[in-house]
Amino acid sequence: MFHKLTGFCAATATFALMTGAAAAEDWSRIQTEEAFKGLAVGPVWHFSSGTQEAFDDGTLTGHVPGYGNFRGTWEWRDEMYCRKIDFYEIDKKGDDCLIIEAQGNDIRITRDFGKGKSYTAQLQPKE
């Protein structure tokens, strides 16, 4: 029985790894400003740690519970979303350029020119 259970666990683990790999492949990198605007300008970005909204005029606003509201500017540069916000750590280091990836109504941002921490947000129409 142990042998059968071990085989089942191995098969389950293999399936989970394959499913995870397939899910990771579903993310598509956003490489143009036009694609970024079509996807992420207008909707509210809902992160587990707060919200953000990017506007067509190059401004952005957001809110992080415990820290408050923030605002700033953004531009598309070198296939990345670059933002400068007047809010704690970002302001201390200036621009933060992020790689943007999309999967359905979700986006994944990776900070520090794609070398930093990644966060996932759900895009929802503004109420």
Placement of each model-derived feature along the sequence:
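Lipid interaction determinants
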Residues: G7, T19-E127
